[in-house]
Amino acid sequence: MSKVLVLKSSILGDFSQSGRLIDEWVAARRASGDTVTVRDLAAEPLPVLDGEIASGLRGGESLSPRQQEALALSDALIAELKVHDQLVVAAPMYNFSIPTQLKNWIDLVARAGVTFTYTAEGPQGLIQGKQAMLITTRGGVHKGSGSDHVVPYLKTVLGFIGITDVDTVYAEALSMGPEAAERGIKDARDQLALVG
Protein backbone atom coordinates (compact mmCIF):
# COMPACT_ATOMS: atom_id res chain seq x y z
CA MET A 1 0.00 0.00 0.00
CA SER A 2 1.19 3.47 -0.90
CA LYS A 3 0.68 6.88 0.61
CA VAL A 4 -0.36 9.32 -2.09
CA LEU A 5 -0.58 13.12 -1.93
CA VAL A 6 -2.94 14.60 -4.52
CA LEU A 7 -2.91 18.29 -5.42
CA LYS A 8 -6.02 19.60 -7.16
CA SER A 9 -5.63 23.08 -8.64
CA SER A 10 -8.64 23.74 -10.88
CA ILE A 11 -10.72 26.82 -10.09
CA LEU A 12 -13.78 25.25 -11.75
CA GLY A 13 -15.03 23.14 -8.84
CA ASP A 14 -17.67 20.65 -9.97
CA PHE A 15 -17.13 21.71 -13.60
CA SER A 16 -13.45 20.76 -13.52
CA GLN A 17 -12.41 18.08 -16.00
CA SER A 18 -9.10 17.49 -14.22
CA GLY A 19 -11.06 17.26 -10.97
CA ARG A 20 -13.34 14.54 -12.35
CA LEU A 21 -10.41 12.54 -13.67
CA ILE A 22 -8.52 12.80 -10.40
CA ASP A 23 -11.60 11.96 -8.32
CA GLU A 24 -12.11 8.74 -10.32
CA TRP A 25 -8.43 7.86 -9.90
CA VAL A 26 -8.49 8.60 -6.15
CA ALA A 27 -11.56 6.39 -5.66
CA ALA A 28 -9.82 3.50 -7.44
CA ARG A 29 -6.62 3.93 -5.41
CA ARG A 30 -8.52 4.07 -2.13
CA ALA A 31 -10.46 0.95 -3.14
CA SER A 32 -7.13 -0.83 -3.70
CA GLY A 33 -6.07 0.02 -0.13
CA ASP A 34 -3.83 3.02 -0.71
CA THR A 35 -3.93 6.00 1.64
CA VAL A 36 -4.73 9.12 -0.37
CA THR A 37 -4.54 12.68 0.96
CA VAL A 38 -6.24 15.26 -1.26
CA ARG A 39 -5.29 18.92 -1.00
CA ASP A 40 -7.61 21.16 -3.04
CA LEU A 41 -5.55 24.29 -3.64
CA ALA A 42 -8.51 26.22 -5.06
CA ALA A 43 -10.96 25.36 -2.28
CA GLU A 44 -8.33 26.09 0.39
CA PRO A 45 -6.02 28.65 -1.25
CA LEU A 46 -2.49 29.23 -0.04
CA PRO A 47 -0.99 32.70 0.35
CA VAL A 48 0.58 34.37 -2.67
CA LEU A 49 4.32 34.84 -2.40
CA ASP A 50 5.31 38.46 -1.87
CA GLY A 51 8.40 40.20 -0.53
CA GLU A 52 7.42 39.81 3.11
CA ILE A 53 6.64 36.10 2.83
CA ALA A 54 9.71 35.38 0.67
CA SER A 55 11.91 37.03 3.27
CA GLY A 56 10.19 35.11 6.07
CA LEU A 57 10.73 31.75 4.37
CA ARG A 58 14.44 32.21 4.98
CA GLY A 59 13.74 32.06 8.72
CA GLY A 60 15.30 34.22 11.37
CA GLU A 61 14.53 35.62 14.78
CA SER A 62 12.61 38.81 14.04
CA LEU A 63 9.80 37.50 11.84
CA SER A 64 6.46 39.27 11.68
CA PRO A 65 3.36 37.25 12.65
CA ARG A 66 2.50 36.93 8.95
CA GLN A 67 6.00 35.62 8.18
CA GLN A 68 5.84 33.16 11.09
CA GLU A 69 2.50 31.89 9.81
CA ALA A 70 3.83 31.48 6.25
CA LEU A 71 6.97 29.70 7.49
CA ALA A 72 4.90 27.30 9.61
CA LEU A 73 2.61 26.61 6.63
CA SER A 74 5.61 26.00 4.36
CA ASP A 75 7.11 23.61 6.91
CA ALA A 76 3.78 21.75 7.14
CA LEU A 77 3.43 21.46 3.33
CA ILE A 78 6.98 20.13 3.02
CA ALA A 79 6.42 17.64 5.86
CA GLU A 80 3.21 16.51 4.13
CA LEU A 81 5.11 15.94 0.88
CA LYS A 82 7.90 14.02 2.63
CA VAL A 83 5.60 11.49 4.34
CA HIS A 84 3.94 10.43 1.07
CA ASP A 85 5.37 7.98 -1.47
CA GLN A 86 3.76 9.54 -4.52
CA LEU A 87 2.74 13.06 -5.53
CA VAL A 88 -0.11 13.42 -8.02
CA VAL A 89 -0.69 16.87 -9.49
CA ALA A 90 -3.89 17.71 -11.34
CA ALA A 91 -2.79 20.65 -13.47
CA PRO A 92 -5.19 22.17 -15.98
CA MET A 93 -3.66 24.50 -18.55
CA TYR A 94 -4.79 28.10 -18.08
CA ASN A 95 -3.49 30.49 -20.74
CA PHE A 96 -0.62 28.08 -21.54
CA SER A 97 0.50 27.77 -17.91
CA ILE A 98 -0.42 26.33 -14.51
CA PRO A 99 -3.10 27.74 -12.20
CA THR A 100 -1.98 30.39 -9.72
CA GLN A 101 -3.15 28.12 -6.92
CA LEU A 102 -0.59 25.47 -7.88
CA LYS A 103 2.17 28.09 -8.25
CA ASN A 104 1.43 29.22 -4.68
CA TRP A 105 2.07 25.65 -3.43
CA ILE A 106 5.34 25.48 -5.39
CA ASP A 107 6.48 28.82 -3.96
CA LEU A 108 5.95 27.54 -0.41
CA VAL A 109 7.57 24.13 -1.01
CA ALA A 110 10.65 25.04 -3.10
CA ARG A 111 12.96 26.31 -0.34
CA ALA A 112 16.74 26.56 -0.45
CA GLY A 113 18.33 24.46 2.25
CA VAL A 114 15.09 22.57 2.87
CA THR A 115 13.90 20.96 -0.39
CA PHE A 116 16.96 21.78 -2.49
CA THR A 117 20.51 22.97 -1.93
CA TYR A 118 23.22 24.56 -4.00
CA THR A 119 26.45 22.59 -4.36
CA ALA A 120 29.70 23.09 -6.28
CA GLU A 121 28.20 20.86 -8.99
CA GLY A 122 24.95 22.85 -9.10
CA PRO A 123 21.56 22.56 -7.42
CA GLN A 124 20.63 19.28 -5.74
CA GLY A 125 17.11 18.21 -4.81
CA LEU A 126 16.59 17.04 -1.25
CA ILE A 127 13.22 15.29 -1.69
CA GLN A 128 14.38 11.81 -2.62
CA GLY A 129 12.66 8.49 -3.34
CA LYS A 130 9.34 9.94 -4.53
CA GLN A 131 7.38 9.25 -7.68
CA ALA A 132 5.09 11.83 -9.26
CA MET A 133 2.29 11.84 -11.79
CA LEU A 134 0.97 14.89 -13.61
CA ILE A 135 -2.60 14.88 -14.90
CA THR A 136 -3.01 17.81 -17.23
CA THR A 137 -6.15 18.93 -19.03
CA ARG A 138 -6.26 21.38 -21.91
CA GLY A 139 -8.83 22.88 -24.23
CA GLY A 140 -6.53 22.49 -27.24
CA VAL A 141 -3.74 20.16 -28.31
CA HIS A 142 -0.37 21.19 -26.87
CA LYS A 143 1.49 17.97 -25.96
CA GLY A 144 5.10 18.16 -27.08
CA SER A 145 4.74 21.64 -28.56
CA GLY A 146 6.26 24.98 -27.64
CA SER A 147 2.89 26.12 -26.31
CA ASP A 148 2.97 23.60 -23.45
CA HIS A 149 4.36 25.49 -20.48
CA VAL A 150 2.68 23.17 -17.96
CA VAL A 151 4.46 19.81 -18.19
CA PRO A 152 8.01 21.07 -18.87
CA TYR A 153 7.72 23.61 -16.05
CA LEU A 154 6.34 21.12 -13.52
CA LYS A 155 8.97 18.52 -14.43
CA THR A 156 11.68 21.16 -13.99
CA VAL A 157 10.37 22.24 -10.58
CA LEU A 158 9.89 18.67 -9.35
CA GLY A 159 13.33 17.67 -10.61
CA PHE A 160 14.85 20.69 -8.90
CA ILE A 161 13.58 19.48 -5.52
CA GLY A 162 14.62 15.89 -6.26
CA ILE A 163 11.53 14.24 -7.80
CA THR A 164 12.67 12.97 -11.19
CA ASP A 165 10.45 9.90 -11.68
CA VAL A 166 7.45 11.64 -13.27
CA ASP A 167 4.65 10.15 -15.38
CA THR A 168 2.32 12.41 -17.34
CA VAL A 169 -1.31 11.88 -18.33
CA TYR A 170 -2.77 14.22 -20.95
CA ALA A 171 -6.43 15.05 -21.58
CA GLU A 172 -6.40 17.30 -24.64
CA ALA A 173 -8.80 18.88 -27.14
CA LEU A 174 -11.43 19.30 -24.43
CA SER A 175 -12.75 22.55 -25.95
CA MET A 176 -12.64 21.37 -29.56
CA GLY A 177 -16.15 19.95 -29.74
CA PRO A 178 -18.01 17.14 -27.96
CA GLU A 179 -16.45 14.27 -29.91
CA ALA A 180 -12.90 15.55 -29.44
CA ALA A 181 -13.54 16.16 -25.74
CA GLU A 182 -14.95 12.66 -25.28
CA ARG A 183 -11.90 11.21 -27.03
CA GLY A 184 -9.57 13.34 -24.89
CA ILE A 185 -11.16 12.14 -21.64
CA LYS A 186 -11.14 8.51 -22.82
CA ASP A 187 -7.47 8.78 -23.78
CA ALA A 188 -6.67 10.19 -20.33
CA ARG A 189 -8.58 7.39 -18.60
CA ASP A 190 -6.68 4.84 -20.69
CA GLN A 191 -3.36 6.48 -19.75
CA LEU A 192 -4.35 6.50 -16.06
CA ALA A 193 -5.13 2.79 -16.23
CA LEU A 194 -1.61 2.16 -17.54
CA VAL A 195 0.42 4.38 -15.19
CA GLY A 196 -1.83 4.79 -12.17
Swiss-Prot record:
It catalyses: 2 a quinone + NADH + H(+) = 2 a 1,4-benzosemiquinone + NAD(+); N,N-dimethyl-1,4-phenylenediamine + anthranilate + 2 NAD(+) = 2-(4-dimethylaminophenyl)diazenylbenzoate + 2 NADH + 2 H(+). Its EC number is 1.6.5.-, 1.7.1.17. InterPro entries: Flavodoxin_fold, Flavoprotein-like_sf, FMN-dep_NADH:Q_OxRdtase_AzoR1, NADH:quinone_OxRdtase_FMN_depd. GO terms for molecular function: electron transfer activity; FMN binding; oxidoreductase activity, acting on NAD(P)H as acceptor; oxidoreductase activity, acting on NAD(P)H, quinone or similar compound as acceptor. Pfam families: Flavodoxin_2 (PF02525). Its cofactor is FMN. The keyword Metal-binding does not apply. It comes from the Bacteria. SUPFAM superfamilies: Flavoproteins. Keywords: Flavoprotein, FMN, NAD, Oxidoreductase. It is an enzyme of class 1 (oxidoreductase). FMN binds at residues 10, 16-18, 93-96, 137-140. Binds 1 FMN per subunit. Signal peptide: none annotated. Belongs to the azoreductase type 1 family. Quinone reductase that provides resistance to thiol-specific stress caused by electrophilic quinones. Homodimer. This is FMN-dependent NADH:quinone oxidoreductase. It comes from Shewanella amazonensis (strain ATCC BAA-1098 / SB2B). The lineage of its organism: Bacteria, Pseudomonadati, Pseudomonadota, Gammaproteobacteria, Alteromonadales.
